[in-house]
Design a protein with these regions (language model features):
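Conserved beta-strand/loop scaffold segments within soluble protein domains that form the structured core
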Residues: 1-86, 90-93, 107-109, 114-135
Length: 135
């Protein structure tokens, strides 16, 4: 049934960009308890560090007391890929616009899941924050 399918698949999807001296700790837990046979859980934490002074800690945790489940976790954090930035700049984008394109490409799938009534407001706020940070 549709109601029971909600509990068959759960996703934790964290994406973002850290600037200046920002620090972030991700603690995600997927707990497969008895009775959840056939369930799938995914958790991921992906961050772009826009400054070498940022700190990103990712602590995904999978707990399981059931058979026949699938649990996946992933984590990735790093500086902007300068090859990508260079590529965009050779296509006419400024450094600032290239940075925004890369960050937006990371977080856009999450923004697109938001209710339409707030989507543009959230995207505008992200752009505003990136525009006011060190370049």
């Amino acid at each position: 049934s549709a109601a029971s399918d909600v509990y068959k698949r759960q996703v934790i999807d964290v994406k973002g960009a850290l600037s200046d001296t920002a620090k972030k700790i991700f603690r995600g837990t997927l707990d497969f308890k008895r009775g959840c046979s056939g369930s799938v859980g995914d958790e991921g934490d992906y961050a772009i560090q826009l400054s070498p002074k940022t700190k990103n800690i990712s602590l995904p945790l999978l707990l399981c007391t059931e058979d026949d489940v699938s649990g996946n976790h992933a984590s990735s954090a790093g500086q902007l890929d300068m090859n990508t930035i260079y590529f965009l700049m050779t296509r006419g984008f400024s450094l600032e616009d290239a940075r925004l394109i890369v960050v937006e490409a990371l977080i856009r799938p999450l923004i697109d899941r938001l209710d339409e009534s707030v989507r543009e407001e959230v995207l505008a706020e992200v752009r505003r924050k990136l525009d006011t940070k060190e370049k």
